């Protein structure tokens, strides 16, 4: 009988611990949901900026495109596409030094993309860096 009472008492003493874990779990779930919602919001914002930048680029508003791509890069500095498109826009504005910096970063992020090497070479050629263009 004493053994049963001891087991019951021990079991009852664990209830507050279980409640504490349940509360911590609920807090964790709420925090996770908040982080996910913020990430979705950032992704939607970046997609809108990407569309806006692409439209501006297509309509030859290169300064506007650079602004949009730069905003994307503030949230995601390793976005290859935004870097590459910003570099192209800078090239069209004859900012070849800025374009070379962006192409170089794009190459560091994805060295498999030959187009960044090619376009960086074109910008170096425009700056009369013929050896660097090769």
Task: Set out the residue ranges of the language-model regions.
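Alpha-helical tetratricopeptide repeat
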Residues: 2-134
